A protein has these predicted regions:
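Compositionally biased terminal segments of proteins
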Residues: 1-143
Length: 143
């Protein structure tokens, strides 16, 4: 799947954010790996110029987690955070650890799996199974 064809990814690209200053988190990495064909929104962790650009487009509000701030764009289709979830690495570490897929930075699936297992929300259960199955296949392919 060409990520640029996905409407939310197209909106993200349209912002012109500095690619070294953000990473796609949440369920976005599942989209990038072809594990999901759709997502309700894209969660972005941003710093520096990317965060500054986001705050020029809309006023930051408290994040639902109560940890940090977020900017909602495109009717909530893009949620840009100044940090990720409590107990996770800061923006610098998340961005440094990104894997690049089709020119965009995504959080590695192993990290996404950890977060989703910790949160263990109803909506995460299917994603946990999809990621685990994918990672198990990767291990088998490399043996």
């Amino acid at each position: 799947m060409d990520l640029c064809d996905h409407p939310l990814v197209g909106k993200l690209i349209s912002l012109g954010l500095e690619r070294g200053d953000f990473v796609v988190a949440g369920s976005g990495p599942l989209l990038a790996h072809g594990l999901r064909s759709s997502v309700g929104d894209l969660d972005i962790v941003a710093r520096g110029d990317a965060w500054k650009r986001a705050t020029e487009l809309a006023d930051p509000v408290p994040a639902p987690s109560g940890y940090g701030l977020m900017v909602l764009l495109f009717d909530g289709g893009l949620e840009i955070f100044d940090r990720w979830l409590p107990g996770t690495p800061g923006p610098d570490a998340l961005i440094a650890g990104a894997e690049w897929i089709q020119g965009l930075p995504f959080c590695p699936l192993r990290e996404v799996l950890e977060w989703k297992r910790t949160a263990l929300r109803e909506k995460d259960l299917k994603d946990i199974l999809l990621i685990q199955k994918h990672l198990d296949r990767e291990v088998l392919d490399h043996e």
